[in-house]
């Protein structure tokens, strides 16, 4: 059994978009919980800065500089991980881009495709290459990130909203296909969070009114635990916080 302070001891976790915002907070929290983290990001310098932080709380991370638009590079990831570790316990599909906030008729084909490639297609390709490794784990965990934008209520958020709606469907479909395995799939809607992407989308908003990424990371730790039973569900951070508070009061 794992020690309470290291609930992910001995687990191998891959986190995309790990160099900033929520992805960074998740990667650090997993390392602190005892996991070995494969941190995926676009720039080597930012990954090295993350590793400096991770080494203060856990073992050095494995750093992977990867452009998620490069499908052939993603496809080779599964075999590479298998050759070195033989399995994968946790996959967090966090990487995303906002794209243009513009009327749909004004979005260029290239801009549309860029957002879909990074936010949706990359997660499908990652699932495809990592699926055999997750099924070799005694408790494979997949956590994909959605957004309130996926509900289609926000004008001018077209590419991002569509990509996140696709992620929700992708997660639910994969969950259905993993029903009779040890893999559990969760889709997380973190809600408004104090990140650079949020600041870009809402420049007039006071960021101090929002939870920090480090506040949201415990939800991802909870879902990554081997004992987590959440499967095929959309988990909303604020609802999770409320449920945690209710459970604590009941004790």
Region spans (language model):
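Active-site loop of short-chain dehydrogenase/reductase
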Residues: 11, 59-60, 87-88, 134-147, ...
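Conserved glycine-rich cofactor-binding loop
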Residues: 12, 19-20
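Conserved glycine-rich Rossmann-like NAD(P)H-binding loop of the short-chain dehydrogenase/reductase
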Residues: 33-49
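The beta1-alpha1 cofactor-binding region of Rossmann-like NAD(H)/NADP(H)-dependent oxidoreductases
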Residues: 45, 65-76, 109
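Catalytic loop of short-chain dehydrogenase/reductase
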Residues: 97, 135, 141-166, 171-180, ...
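Substrate-binding pocket helix/loop in short-chain dehydrogenase/reductase
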Residues: 102-104, 111-116
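C-terminal helical subdomain
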Residues: 180-183, 187-188, 195, 204-251
